Amino acid sequence: VSDFSLLGGIRGSFDNGLNYDFSGRTGESEIRYTLGNTINPSQGRASQQSFKPGDLINSETQFQADFNYEFETAFGTPVLLAFGTSYMDESYEVVQGELNSYTAGPHATQDPFGLCNADKTAPTAAGTSVIAGGSTLDCANSSDPVYQVVGVGSNGFPGFSPQFSEKYERSSFAVFA
């Protein structure tokens, strides 16, 4: 996590009694994610064990001008008139993670090695071979492990894909009295 901010301002009064307060601020916060000692289960044994799933960046800049003026009324009670304006520019960015942190590997589909036939009723030659080696493969049983799909993306925190990586910005302006 890295953060920085800067702010400043000045207050005072004009000769006519109008008080002012001018200020500005800017800042940014960035989170750079890193994962270690984990895998992308859908990539199986070929999975790397550390990932950079992406970053989050938030930044804001604001300028403000506030004024107030106190004047006497005919009722003998002073009235304070306050008014001002504010402008703010802000952005939020989701930075894409590295490819293997969000992509699906071969284990993200049912029967990734083609052990069962297309209609899921009988083993293929490859399936017959693993059965001969001691496997309990049962292609007719939909709960057989060959049909179980594992998670996609780095385990614990899948990375940000291009589909969800973008910079969002907006500006706002306000006046008050």
Q: Each PLM stretch: what is its role?
A:
Residues 1-177:
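Face-selective signature of the C-terminal outer-membrane beta-barrel domain
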